[in-house]
Amino acid sequence: MSELYHPVKIGNVELKGNLFLAPVAGYSDAAFRSVCIENGACFTYTEMVSAEALVRKNLKTEILMRRACNEKAYSVQIFGGEPEIMAEAAHIVLEKTHCEVIDINCGCPVPKIIKTGAGSALTRDPDRLFKVAEAVVKAAGGR
């Protein structure tokens, strides 16, 4: 085995390799993730999912979180800037998907995302980022 390709552990999730599919808005749906798994991806992420939309019970948003039939382990990426909303969204994600990982989007630079205090805006407000992360971890039961 090459030293570049090796097993990885995320919390209690053990993966046979370190080829991850990044979350890409508009692309990382279940069908695309399935094809990537067939071609060697060991772990995948959904495209970013709006915490606000999940809390409002938006069906189109829930569809984004569906597990592909060949996904053994995957992450649902959520975005938002309000700790309470993010916590409620994390609870909904776990209830509906049983995903192995919940990822908090802190990197999206798109203006319509950052103007709400989400995405990369969280990195400019460490206190808020901490509160969001703390709320999500608590809602996920420390997983």
Regions found by a protein language model. Name each.
Residues 15-16, 34:
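Non-catalytic, substrate/partner-engaging modules appended to enzymatic cores
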